[in-house]
Amino acid sequence: MFSLKMRASRNGKHVSGAERLVTEEKIEEISSELIKRAMGHENGVPDFINLKIEKVTEKINNLKHLEIKTVHSTSKETSRVIARNLLKNELEKYYLKNGKDIEKIDELIDFAFKIIDEGNMRGAAILDLDGNRLETDSNRGIRVKNIDTTDELSEKILGNSSLSERTVDAIAIATKVVNCGVISELCTSDNFSYTTGYIATKDGYFRILNLKGNGEVGGRVFFVENSKIDELYDKLENMPVIVY
C-alpha cells in the first residue's frame, strides 16, 4: 500500500487537502484525481500543490465506520444548539470522571466554535478539558493522515443521493479520530458553499445541516481528556487506517 497526501494553497492560505491509501497499480489514477480535485476547488485555483507519495510499511488497521446519522435543521442557530447538546452530553461524562466543574463545558464549546469560525487552519485544533490548546503549531494544527475507506463503503455512501465525497472523507477522519482516543470532534467544511458540519463521538457521526452559513470558513476541533500529545500526534498522523 502507498499513502498519497495532497495539499493545495493560494497566497499561502490553505485551499484543499486529501488523503488516500492505495495499491501500487492505482497510484497514477488516484494522483490524477487528487490534482483535479485541487485545481477544481470552489475556494479558488491554487498556486501551490504538493503531492506526497510514500510506501506504507506498517500494518494496516481496519476500522468499522461510525454510524452515520443525519440531523435536519433549517437554521445555523438551531444547528449549533443541536451540536452543543451533543458535545455537552459527551464531555460531561469526562468532566465528572475527572472531578471538573461541568458548568465550564459551555465555555469550552464556545472556544471551539470561535476556533472553527476563524478558519484558515490546515489541520485541527486540540483542546483539553481545561480549554488549553495542545497543538504543537496553533496555525497549522494537526492533520489526520494515512487514512482511506474501502471501495465498498465509498460506493455505499455515494449511493445515497444526500451524501457526497465530503461524507466519505469525513467518515474516514471521524472514525480514526474517535478510535485514537479523542472524546469528540467538531467540524465544519472549508468549502464556502458546503454548510453541513458534524459532531463525532463513539456513539456516531452526526451530520448536522446548516452548521455554518453559506460563504463562511470552516474548521476542526478535537476534544481530548489528557495531554499525552506526542502519542496522539503519532497515532493521528502515522497509524495507517482503512475504514470499512
Curated annotation (Swiss-Prot):
Its EC number is 6.2.1.14. GO terms for molecular function: 6-carboxyhexanoate-CoA ligase activity; ATP binding; magnesium ion binding. It holds the Pfam family BioW. One of its GO terms (biological process) is biotin biosynthetic process. Its cofactor is Mg(2+). It comes from the Archaea. Keywords: ATP-binding, Biotin biosynthesis, Ligase, Magnesium, Nucleotide-binding. Pathway: Metabolic intermediate metabolism; pimeloyl-CoA biosynthesis; pimeloyl-CoA from pimelate: step 1/1. It catalyses: heptanedioate + ATP + CoA = 6-carboxyhexanoyl-CoA + AMP + diphosphate. The keyword Nucleotide-binding applies. Homodimer. Belongs to the BioW family. NCBIfam families: PRK01322.1. Catalyzes the transformation of pimelate into pimeloyl-CoA with concomitant hydrolysis of ATP to AMP. This is 6-carboxyhexanoate--CoA ligase. It comes from Methanococcus maripaludis (strain C7 / ATCC BAA-1331).
